Swiss-Prot record:
This is Putative ankyrin repeat protein FPV223. The keyword Membrane does not apply. Keywords: ANK repeat, Repeat. InterPro entries: Ankyrin_rpt (IPR002110), Ankyrin_rpt-contain_sf (IPR036770). It comes from the Viruses. The keyword Repeat applies. ANK repeats lie at residues 21-50, 54-83, 85-114, 118-140.
Length: 141
């Protein structure tokens, strides 16, 4: 945290990315589960849309690692839809099968009827991956 504060004090660009990985300080805050750093960076306008060399956003990493608090923080920082490999966040979460992350996304306003580039909804993905629990969750909603 001290390093982040010092960098901001001297107006260093907090969105600068690593040459090799393309990751920003926001990516690393998520990857290392550092909520204070994430909050600090978001308050200073860190780019939540910035993708790394793998085309992953900080939100994608938060979903993959089941960091629901961070998912919520990122979603509340800006209302947005981010595509990763032509799929939307909710579609990606369904692929992982993590019901808690899926519920977190839905509870924070992610559109459950969104469609990917092929016109498939999250429910289509749940059926495609054979995840009965997720299918039931969508049918009950």
């Amino acid at each position: 945290m001290n390093v982040l504060k010092l960098l901001c004090k001297y107006h260093v660009d907090i969105n600068i990315s690593s040459h090799s990985s393309g990751r920003t300080s926001l990516h690393y805050a998520v990857l290392f589960n550092h909520k204070r750093a994430l909050s600090f960076l978001l308050a200073r306008g860190a780019d939540v849309f910035k993708k790394d060399a793998c085309m992953c956003t900080p939100l994608y990493y938060a979903m993959l690692s089941d960091q629901r608090d961070m998912v919520t923080m990122l979603l509340h920082s800006k209302k947005y839809i981010v595509k990763f490999r032509n799929k939307l966040d909710l579609h990606n979460a369904i692929e992982t099968g993590n019901i808690k992350v899926i519920k977190t996304l839905l509870d924070n306003g992610v559109n459950e009827n969104s469609v990917d580039k092929d016109g498939l909804t999250p429910l289509h993905y749940a059926v495609k991956y054979g995840n009965i629990s997720i299918v039931k969750m969508f049918v009950i909603r």
